[in-house]
């Protein structure tokens, strides 16, 4: 399988499956001298850990304790590859015995079979959402690099199950259920998820990511535009079905004069561009949103086929999230950080040559 490495200069390669021995990754290209500890990575992993997130979360309990294997000495990176590993401890593969030969609707079962001629039916293997653990750990390394440059990334939920939130306090979202950007919406989202769970169904939502302190000049036109790379990063997450930057699809309904961000001596008067112009960061806050589909594992009867082409009725068992939100929020934050870290180092190379 190819496609397990992300980045050009700051590169993350990941490994592992949902029901394998463990997951992990290697970050190559991280400069020396960056403050980094296991605790810093663990803090990010704890935000996406299974068994939390209230009624939306899976019943699978994983401690997700990370071990740094290389690349760090006395609390700082050495410039060599940063390797990390997390053990799987709560696999329950017996839950999947009845779907050994059955394709689950909405999952990658049928496409993995078409591509490889075989698949790991236990929780989806590499296509499972558990794969994102390695992204979050790698993203923590990227965030450590960005922090040294005054760049921070935040992510929060702006809509769940069709119910929007008012982004009144995005900074406080990290301490609220569902990573909600306002307090009042939490009870409403909680009731919605419980209702959907009671019906044996699932819901999706929309997550917003913001990056602050991004300097002007990041991005490599034409095919490595910052917005193109960011969209690629977010779309690479399995549950994401759409990405918009800044005003996004709403810009299609505006006039040019309304969509343009006027410039003044004090800076930009708006941010419809989402902090990116011509594929290059403008110095404003970088803003992106990702549409997250409902989890395809629903506790209802569904029509499908098995690997011999026979029609069957399937009711998915096992332990599953009711929504990818809130656990996908740290994943999208991580992918944004990885993109910015890579672009930052690409820009440093260019300016070094120019100097």
Curated annotation (Swiss-Prot):
Coiled coil: none annotated. NADP(+) binds at residue 48. GO terms for cellular component: cytosol. Its cofactor is FMNH2. The keyword Flavoprotein applies. Reduced FMN (FMNH(2)). It catalyses: 5-O-(1-carboxyvinyl)-3-phosphoshikimate = chorismate + phosphate. Keywords: Amino-acid biosynthesis, Aromatic amino acid biosynthesis, FAD, Flavoprotein, FMN, Lyase, NADP. It comes from the Bacteria. It is an enzyme of class 4 (lyase). Pathway: Metabolic intermediate biosynthesis; chorismate biosynthesis; chorismate from D-erythrose 4-phosphate and phosphoenolpyruvate: step 7/7. One of its GO terms (molecular function) is chorismate synthase activity. Homotetramer. This reaction introduces a second double bond into the aromatic ring system. NCBIfam families: aroC, PRK05382.1. Belongs to the chorismate synthase family. This is Chorismate synthase. It comes from Oleidesulfovibrio alaskensis (strain ATCC BAA-1058 / DSM 17464 / G20) (Desulfovibrio alaskensis).
């Amino acid at each position: 399988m190819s496609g397990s490495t992300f980045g050009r200069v700051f590169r993350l390669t990941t490994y592992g499956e949902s029901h394998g021995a463990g997951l992990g990754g290697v970050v190559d290209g991280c400069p020396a001298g960056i403050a980094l500890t296991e605790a810093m990575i663990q803090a990010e992993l704890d935000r996406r850990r299974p068994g939390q997130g209230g009624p939306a979360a899976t019943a699978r309990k994983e401690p997700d304790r990370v071990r740094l294997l290389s690349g760090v000495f006395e609390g700082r990176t050495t410039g060599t590859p940063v390797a990390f590993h997390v053990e799987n401890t709560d696999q329950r593969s017996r839950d999947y015995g009845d779907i050994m030969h059955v394709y689950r609707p909405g999952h990658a079962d049928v496409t993995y079979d078409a591509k490889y001629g075989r698949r790991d039916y236990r929780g989806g293997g590499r296509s499972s959402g558990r794969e994102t653990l390695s992204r979050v750990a790698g993203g923590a390394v990227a965030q450590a690099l960005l922090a040294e440059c005054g760049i921070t990334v935040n992510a929060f939920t702006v809509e769940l199950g069709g119910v929007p939130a008012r982004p009144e306090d995005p900074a406080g979202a990290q301490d609220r259920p569902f990573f909600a950007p306002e307090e009042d919406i939490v009870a409403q989202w909680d009731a919605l998820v419980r209702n959907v769970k009671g019906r044996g169904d699932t819901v999706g939502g929309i997550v917003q990511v913001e990056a602050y302190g991004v300097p002007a000049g990041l991005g490599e036109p034409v095919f490595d535009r910052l917005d193109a790379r960011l969209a690629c990063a977010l779309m690479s997450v399995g549950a994401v079905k759409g990405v918009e930057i800044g005003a996004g699809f709403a810009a299609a309904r505006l006039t040019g004069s309304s969509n343009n961000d006027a410039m003044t001596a004090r800076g930009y008067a708006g941010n419809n561009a989402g902090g990116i112009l011509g594929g290059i960061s403008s110095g404003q806050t970088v803003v992106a949103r990702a549409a997250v589909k409902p989890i395809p594992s629903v506790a209802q009867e569904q029509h499908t086929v098995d690997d011999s082409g026979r029609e069957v009725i399937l009711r998915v068992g096992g332990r599953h999230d009711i929504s990818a939100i809130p656990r996908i929020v740290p994943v999208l934050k991580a992918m944004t950080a990885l993109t910015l870290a890579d672009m930052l180092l690409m820009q440093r190379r260019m300016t070094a040559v120019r100097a």
